A protein has these predicted regions:
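A residue-identity detector for tryptophan
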Residues: 45, 55, 110, 160, ...
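Short, compositionally biased low-complexity segments
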Residues: 37-47, 124-130, 150-155
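Leu/Val/Ala/Ile-rich N-terminal alpha-helices, chiefly Sec-type signal peptides and the beginnings
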Residues: 2-102
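Sequence-level detector for tyrosine residue identity
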Residues: 6-9, 60, 113, 139, ...
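Internal, Lys/Arg-enriched amphipathic helical interaction segments that engage polyanionic partners
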Residues: 84-145
Length: 199
């Protein structure tokens, strides 16, 4: 079962050698979909955009995932050589983007706060650093069909792991289950494959 799942992903990776993405490109694409001017409060705007209930567990997980991705990109860029001269600029844009997902951003009209941070002037630098980042961290840019195939394979694997976990209660298996559940959440809700090395 595990071997079959791995080879299924390996086949997708081979088929997508020319089509790559990276953490910054995925985040920029998501933020592009959130940019816009709406008079509803930020929490309502985001809940509607993601198709979740406002202040639900899924809502909080989405906000956390976005902030985690912003901080992850900051950490990745800090660890790479040759980016020092641009680091302070991109960090300013990352800080501005993050403000949209703070308490203020969620509790006032999106148009008066969130939209002022999730905008072209902050997203464009993220797209530009994507090219630099992709040389170091990249993974397949999946089509909708390929994403569905990955989701199907991971669900299959989860089912198998959960059946065995009921009998054996192994803490390592539980950690794998929780990791796969988070992976599924991100790929289904945010359409993020994740970091290349996490696969």
């Amino acid at each position: 079962m595990l071997v079959a799942s791995y080879f299924s992903y390996a086949q997708i990776a081979r088929d997508n050698l020319a089509k790559k993405t990276d953490p910054a490109a995925e985040l920029a694409q998501l933020l592009d979909s959130l940019s816009g001017h709406s008079d509803v409060i930020g929490s309502q705007w985001l809940a509607t955009k993601f198709g979740v209930e406002e202040w639900s567990l899924d809502f909080y997980q989405i906000i956390f995932s976005i902030i985690q991705r912003i901080e992850g990109i900051r950490g990745m860029l800090a660890s790479l050589e040759g980016f020092e001269h641009l680091r302070s600029d991109i960090e300013g844009h990352l800080d501005a983007l993050k403000l949209a997902f703070t308490t203020t951003g969620l509790q006032v009209a999106w148009v008066s706060y969130g939209a002022n941070h999730v905008n072209r002037s902050n997203i464009q630098p993220l797209k530009m650093c994507s090219a630099f980042l992709r040389a170091h961290i990249s993974y397949p840019d999946l089509s909708i069909e390929e994403r569905d195939q990955v989701i199907y394979t991971v669900n299959d694997l989860l089912k198998w792991l959960l059946e065995h976990q009921l009998e054996e209660n192994d803490f390592i298996r539980q950690a794998i289950i929780e990791g796969l559940e988070q992976f599924l959440f991100r790929i289904e809700r945010l359409e993020w494959l994740g970091w290349g090395y996490s696969l």
